[in-house]
Amino acid sequence: MQLDRVIAVRTDKTVFKDGDRCVKVFGGAYDKADVLSEALNQARAEEAGLPVPRVLEVGVVNGRWAIVSDLIRGTTLDETLERDPEGCIARLAAMQADLHRAPCPILPRLRDRMVRRIQQTELPATVRYELCARVENMPQKHQLCHGDFRPSNVMTDENGKCWLLDWKEAARGDGAADAARTCLTLRMSGRGSLADNYAACYCEKSGTDRESLRRWLPMVAAARLTSARAQERALLMTWLKEIGVV
């Protein structure tokens, strides 16, 4: 294996180019089960006919677990967002709406994962109980949810085709919760106006009621606390206080 160059560096993982292959090498925080789960999610999305890089193998590189996939040559929507925000937001929303209409393979339940993560936070017990109860009372749906649908996880290749990357958080559940997380991600990155535009665009393309997204936001934000870095966690807590959750 010839790791030609680094393509991307993310939290505790590094993505390398190996000829026509992409090698995602995970850091020590990821165990075997985490990596195999992500590879399985990606393979199931691929088998469902979604635009996903093929999983070629899972192995160990220099003592670290790695997923090897087809290399997609192109740019992420995050790289083009600044020069064409409206076009990127429209394209992103259309892709997520299409994703939620796709046949859903066997995946973990989103609501179970969300409840588990809310329970793991340091929020007051009464707040955790209330938020978990809200999750359980939301409509039960079985849509394919990416779980981390953001501009940096959508790549446009040389032919203009969009590909979905990073399937670690994939689950089945309410697409409105998935879209709410995308809105929250945009807002936490300082793109509040784009988050509002995205919500409107997604609701139009998917036929989702805007209120559904709004109702999911507090639970999505609370569940995000467990994996957020310090700065993002502070922003999430500030926002949860502003809307009266904490």
Where are the predicted features?
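An alpha-helical support segment within catalytic cores of ATP-dependent transferases
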Residues: 101-147, 157-158, 242
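Internal "kinase-insert"/substrate-recognition segments embedded within catalytic cores
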Residues: 80-111
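Helix-rich C-terminal or lid/interface subdomains of diverse kinases
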Residues: 74, 181-246
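Active-site acidic catalytic loop and adjacent metal/ATP-binding pocket
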Residues: 14-17, 132-177
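Short beta-strand micro-motifs within the conserved protein kinase catalytic domain, predominantly
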Residues: 54-65
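ATP-binding glycine-rich loop module of kinase domains
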Residues: 6-35, 78
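Conserved short submotifs of the Hanks-type protein kinase catalytic core
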Residues: 63-75
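The N-lobe alphaC helix and its flanking beta3-alphaC-beta4 segment of protein kinase-like domains
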Residues: 32-48
